[in-house]
Amino acid sequence: RELAELTIGFYRRNYIEGLFLSSGVLRSPDYTTERMIECLRILREEYRFNGYIHAKAIPGTSPELVQRLGLLADRLSVNIELPSQKGLQTLAPDKSKQAILRPMAQIRDRARESKAELVKSHHAPVFAPAGQSTQLIVGATADNDRHILHLTQSLYEKYRLKRVFYSAYVPVVENSLLPSKDTKPPLLREHRLYQADWLLRFYGF
C-alpha cells in the first residue's frame, strides 16, 4: 500500500506518467508476485490509477498469478538477462531456460486471446495490451553479438515481443566467472545492438 500511495501521489502531481514495478524474489516467486498484484490492485481499483504500468513477471510464478498480473498491467516483461543456457548454468544456476520461456509463451497466448475476445465484446478484460518485453545483459558472458541477435530475432518471431532491451554489463565485484572490475562497460556494443535491433524490427533484416 505504501508504494501504491507514493505512486498515486506522484501521478496526481504530474511528476510521473506511469510505474515500472519490479522486485527481487522474496520467499518465492508466487509470494512476491502476490504482493505486486496487491499493489497494482490498490492502484487500479481503489485509486483509479489510469497511468501506464509495466510489471515484471518473475520466472517460476504460477500461471494463475501471471494471468492476474497481466490484467492489471499494460506491459509485462520476463527478463532473460543472460543470453545462453550455458551462461545461466554458470552465473545463475537457480534459473532455467524453460522457467523463463514458459511465462513468455503464456503472455503471448493470453494477449492473443484477449484481442480476440475484445472483438466479440468491448467489455472483455484486457490482458497486457502493450505486450511484453525482455532484457539481455551484454558482456557478462562470452556470448557474441551474432548469438544475441539470433536470440533476439527468435524472441520477436516466436514470442511476439514488442521490445528487447540491452544492458551493458558493469563490473562491480571481483569474480573469476565474470569480467574483471577494471573492464569498461561495452557501451558501444550495446549501442550497436540497439541499431541492429531497429533493423530487425522495422526492416525485417
Descriptions of predicted regions:
Residues 51, 130-132, 159-162, 196-198:
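Structural beta-strand/beta-sheet cores of well-ordered domains, especially the beta-sheet scaffolds
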Residues 97-101, 145, 149, 190-193:
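Amphipathic alpha-helical transducer elements in NTP-driven molecular machines
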Residues 145-169, 174:
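Long, internal scaffold/assembly segments composed of regular secondary structure
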